[in-house]
Amino acid sequence: MTKQPEDWLDDVPGDDIEDEDDEIIWVSKSEIKRDAEELKRLGAEIVDLGKNALDKIPLDADLRAAIELAQRIKMEGRRRQLQLIGKMLRQRDVEPIRQALDKLKNRHNQQVVLFHKLENLRDRLIDQGDDAIAEVLNLWPDADRQQLRTRIRNAKKEKEGNKPPKSARQIFQYLRELAENEG
């Protein structure tokens, strides 16, 4: 057996390139699995969206076809299809998809908050009457005062008579129309 010289390691090709900026980042297998699972969950969120919401997310043709297929499949086949969608997402830039999905969620959350505010305003209209009507007219100057008073009066009668809250629903719908016409 021949003995190699001590400097044999110095002759490795490509070893003369010394760049400290090229650090190798090691990723654990567990982290890779967590990332894959997170992309699978993202795919499941996209699959659960309706057609109108799906149109607002930037997807290429292959991914969109896989998502539409997953929407039609049930049980075990759906699980396998979600794994395929997760795999497809790993090969793509998912940041635009995440941003579009967050935008959709945020729009839904804003709508829920608006509905809660309108419900509270409706309840105040029924309980307080003219004071709350003044608040509505400050928010929406084109609101019909007479229509509000009539509906409030009917809502109070329904509440006292333990009848279904038909007028209260009408007040809410009217307030929602005012809010939508404003924005």
From Swiss-Prot:
It is found in: Cytoplasm. InterPro entries: DarP, DarP_sf. GO terms for biological process: assembly of large subunit precursor of preribosome. Keywords: Cytoplasm, Ribosome biogenesis, RNA-binding, rRNA-binding. Its main location: cytoplasm. It comes from the Bacteria. GO terms for cellular component: cytosol. One of its GO terms (molecular function) is ribosome binding. Belongs to the DarP family. Member of a network of 50S ribosomal subunit biogenesis factors which assembles along the 30S-50S interface, preventing incorrect 23S rRNA structures from forming. Promotes peptidyl transferase center (PTC) maturation. This is Dual-action ribosomal maturation protein DarP. The gene is darP.
